Design a protein with these regions (language model features):
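Extracellular/periplasmic ligand-binding regions of membrane signal-transduction receptors
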Residues: 1-21, 42-60
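General structural signal for secondary-structure boundaries
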Residues: 1-3, 11, 64, 71-74, ...
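Secondary-structure transition/capping residues
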Residues: 2-5, 37, 141
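Well-ordered, non-membrane alpha-helical segments in soluble/globular domains
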Residues: 19-25, 69-74
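Solvent-exposed, extracytoplasmic
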Residues: 21-33, 112-162
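Extracytoplasmic/periplasmic ligand-binding sensor regions of membrane-associated signaling proteins
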Residues: 31-124
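GAF sensory domains
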Residues: 51-61, 153-166
Length: 166
């Protein structure tokens, strides 16, 4: 929490409470799943990455990603660069900025230098959303997954020929 107070001094009491709640959630997740050592949350309202190391602006987060280390002793950038498949971990209650909802967390599993497994939550999906997707898939409906940038523009798609970059 070293630089946490720097970012919350001027924030409203409500914002301070929510940011502290997010930090507590990270601590809870890390204590519950010690193999997950690259956990962070992003508060779009505040433009901050909340990590176990404190709060970072987007610029700071990406500058620091080479110096922040995971509990397995790797740099955060190593964890981000690791090319490993998705794996389903668990359903958990996630108290986020906007809701207290049951989420399905998909984890990218990696092994640290010490041989201890660790990982990174790369996608949290509300269980209701995932249920709807699975219903459509089982009904034979054609679905396309699209990755969007912050402005809502398509970056990548699971369907060949889907327009991106427009």
């Amino acid at each position: 929490l070293s630089n946490f107070e720097n970012y919350t001094k001027s924030a409203s009491a409500d914002s301070q409470f929510k940011l502290k709640n997010m930090m507590q959630q990270i601590v809870y997740l890390e204590n519950s799943y010690p193999q997950l050592d690259s956990i962070w949350l992003y508060s779009s309202r505040d433009g901050l990455f909340i990590t176990k190391y404190g709060c970072f602006t987007e610029e700071e987060f990406f500058q620091e990603r080479y110096t922040l280390t995971t509990s397995a002793g790797r740099s955060l950038q190593d964890a981000l660069d690791e090319q490993q498949p998705f794996s389903y971990l668990a359903t958990m209650q996630v108290k986020s900025y906007y809701s207290n909802t049951e989420c399905i967390s998909f984890i990218r599993s990696v092994s640290g230098y010490s041989g201890q497994p660790d990982g990174q939550i790369i996608l949290n999906v509300k269980s209701g959303t995932l249920t709807n997707i699975l219903k459509k898939v089982s009904a034979g409906e054609d679905l396309t997954a699209v990755l969007l940038d912050q402005e809502g523009g398509a970056i990548a798609s699971s369907r060949e020929g889907f327009p991106t970059g427009e």
